Amino acid sequence: MNSADPSSTESISEPSFLDCWYLTGATASGKTGVGIELAQRLDAEIISLDSMALYREMDIGTAKPTAQERQCVPHHLLDVLSPRDEFSVSNYLEAARRMMIEIHSRGRQVLFVGGTPLYLKALLRGIFRGPPADWEFRRAVEEELKESGLPALYERLQQVDPLSAAKLHPHDKRRIIRALEVHRATGRPISHLQTQFEEGRPAESCHVFALLWPRAVLHQRINRRVDEMFAAGFVEEVRGLLQRHGTLSRTALQAVGYREVIAHLQGRADLATTIEAVKARTRQFARHQETWFRSLSECRFVPLQEGSSGQEVAQQILRAGSGVGR
């Protein structure tokens, strides 16, 4: 049996993941509004596809659906973790699988909405049964980084897994550490284990849609959203998190903007500089997301323009997906 086949019982991914609907896109692309419109037309419930929306108390910076929006359509996998909790892709897949089965038992469709590329790829293609996260090893590596720096860590990866090293940017700390972690636990390169999960299905056979704005328009939307976040109390949200929890988990700190606001609260940047830094990092993250989505053969882009309404976009997606599987 081929363990790379998402229909395989050996894969972490379930075959019915491939029958679900997916709405993704870069940050600030309007996924929440379109997702609600689409879910209502599909008689679907929404499972969040956002790694940071899992965390409680991190509402403004993650742009979670509001309470009013959640009343329109049931939403799942929101506010399920403490800001101090670590969470992996494997953890997400298991939680999503349970929720998907529960929703299907009610006779309803499942719509995943969010912009975390790793989660999307894992749902569509599965993941290899790699070792669980070794937080003790990761803490030791973080200490090592303080002394020798990231270049030394990257050089170590080049020695044990040159194929992975060639694919990764020398500054991609998180994935460099994960590759070393897998090699340490299994004695095998992560690149060897991952190759069987690289093939995707044609877009025409899937219900996977990504919202795509012209770059200049998306940047305007991002800048406007960041301004609104700070006006809504983003700094106060982060201050409260630090007061209640002391620190955030490594995975929670991956949320765009939180490190920048923490630096501001520590007196290392004024507010205006912080706002601009968050805008710049968010734009960078949006480019990263779109690069990922373009690499997935399952994904169909939905071009948008100023004036596009959520209702119109949802109807367009529904028409495009109506023939899938027939």
Where would I find each of the regions flagged by the language model?
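Phosphate/pyrophosphate-binding catalytic cores of soluble transferases and nucleic-acid-acting enzymes
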Residues: M1-R326
